[in-house]
Amino acid sequence: MQNTTKRDLERLINNKTSNTSLADILFLKFSSDTGTILNFGRRGSLFAPEAILNVVKKMACHNLLKWSDIELANSALENIDFKASQKSLALQIEQTLAAQARTQKFVYLGGGHDYIYPTVKALNRFTKKMVIINLDAHLDTRTDPDPNSGTPFRQIASEFDGDLEIIQLGIHDFANSISTMSNLSRAREVVATYEDVRFGTKDFTETDKFLARVIPYQKETVYVFSLDADALESGIMEGVSAVNHRGLPYDFVEDVLLYAIDELKCQHFGIFEYNPVYDNLSQKGARTLASLIYQIMDDRFFT
């Protein structure tokens, strides 16, 4: 027991604060899988935020940055009126962001990918120019009449007030219907399939050149990094609703993340759709995602 206490002093758990106003990094947790279930996905992503953070807490700490977390999902309301719950959550996120004068990095942990919609809706209150970088096997632009984890980017595109670009990386034709691929109403959408990414980076060896061409830096633009865990190859990511047998390699995903941080000055990061129920006993998926979060929490990216 004494060894555990001593070791925790050198782990990230020691930098956690219960006072969110003191946090340099804030995790907004969405511990619900209602949107995934409405999209006919497998139950279990509601456990993802805690499963991922439990791994993060044990990682060695090499800076003095404070972090905190807050739970915002309201599964009870979601089960009664999902549309109303999304509007309510967008307001909650907006109020949370407005109150965080000190925080420089925000990490949004789902839950289903439906949570990117209220997140962007809230961010739209602070900016009229945004680029979303979505790493995913699916476009998540379904034309379903009722919202779910497969519809968020079509919802975002139809409601965004301003200049919006959605860059989709790692998409598979076999995972997206013709209607899903139909044009978005009020946003520019750039789609780079798995094949486009693979050949554009020369088998993932020239990622920086590819990213500089596809996602050039634009001034006065808010960048949002959004990762659906099923974008990652199944060898490292089994714990998802739809396992990707031809997914992106970890190094590429990390390169995109680092490019977003270093070159695009990104402050908003979403990680969605991880399902610990279907992960293996080694928590391989949670450890993979925690490694990405560890990069976000590195102090070399803070001013």
Task: Explain the meaning of each model-derived region.
Residues 2-303:
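Conserved alpha-helical scaffold segments that buttress catalytic/binding sites
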